[in-house]
Amino acid sequence: MSGWRDIGRRVVDFAVTFILYYIFGVALHEMGHALVGQALGWQASVTYPSPWAGWTSFPQWQQMPMLDMVLIALAGGLIVCAFFLILSAFTEDWESDMVLLFFAPLHGFYSLFEVAYILHAIPQWVLATIPILPAAIIWMWMLKTRG
């Protein structure tokens, strides 16, 4: 019976860890956009309508040079990707490592797709769905190489 208890505990640990890192990732992602925008001299505001979603607004978005737009778009996801990869190197529990290694590439790919979106190269539905596919492939590869 203790085997089932251990499995149940790990499932609950994984679910709680997933939710917490998801919320933290959303917050850090949007703050990354805002901080890079402010560093480039633009006014920014971050809105979190729920723990599951957020967006960063720039009142002067239409007046920005394309390079600034691209840097701001890249910043959110790449900051989370780098932070989660570094954090996973120091994580000893299985649940945190699994979640961090899933969200790191997801945010990395999402940042690339955000650039494509602001360049009008992809529609919003692609931005909202497709980055999970390459992220899942990389996640499985990282899990396999970690043993």
Set out the residue ranges of the language-model regions:
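Membrane-interfacial, low-structure loops and terminal tails that flank and connect transmembrane helices
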Residues: 1-6
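Short pre-active-site segment immediately N-terminal to the catalytic Zn-binding motif
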Residues: 7-27
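Small-residue-rich helix-interface/hinge motifs
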Residues: 21-69
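Metalloprotease/metallohydrolase-associated module, dominated by Zn2+-dependent proteases
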Residues: 55-147
